[in-house]
């Protein structure tokens, strides 16, 4: 990838691990960004994927796309970042980025000065907590405010 292009990091863990919902949103977002923008390079970040993927070959490939995978599962990464609050920046896995986007409710730690973009799709975990597992409600109630 040319060094002069801005590098946009995107957490694509949901795109790899979820067939619908936020996973589909993230896959469509990446496709649309690549189709409509030729000025940026994209560093797609994922936690270690499961053995079986719900969607075969979920991510695009190309000269402006670089996939970086952490050696830990999403469960372990989120425990480190949001339960233990270890400030291990996502750039440890992605390398240098100019912007980081998390499309799935929470941001990982980033290096000081790295701009971030967060998508919070809804607040149903606040308004309808009975429709979620208690563990997920507890996690989101803790992690989302820290990310916003």
Q: Which stretches of residues belong to each language-model region?
A:
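Carbohydrate transferase catalytic cores enriched for Leloir-type hexosyltransferases
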Residues: 1-148
């Amino acid at each position: 990838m040319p060094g002069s292009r801005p590098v946009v990091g995107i957490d694509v863990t949901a795109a790899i691990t979820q067939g619908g919902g936020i996973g589909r949103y993230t896959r469509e977002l990446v496709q649309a960004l690549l189709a409509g923008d030729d000025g940026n390079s994209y560093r797609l970040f994922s936690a270690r994927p499961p053995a079986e993927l719900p969607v075969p070959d979920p991510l695009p490939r190309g000269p402006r796309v670089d996939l970086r995978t952490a050696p830990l599962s999403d469960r372990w990464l989120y425990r480190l970042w949001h339960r233990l609050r270890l400030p291990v920046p996502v750039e440890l896995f992605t390398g240098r980025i100019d912007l980081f986007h998390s499309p799935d409710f929470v941001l990982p730690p980033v290096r000081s000065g790295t701009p971030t973009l967060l998508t919070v799709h809804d607040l149903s975990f606040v308004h309808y907590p009975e429709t979620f597992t208690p563990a997920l409600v507890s996690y989101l109630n803790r992690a989302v405010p820290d990310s916003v």
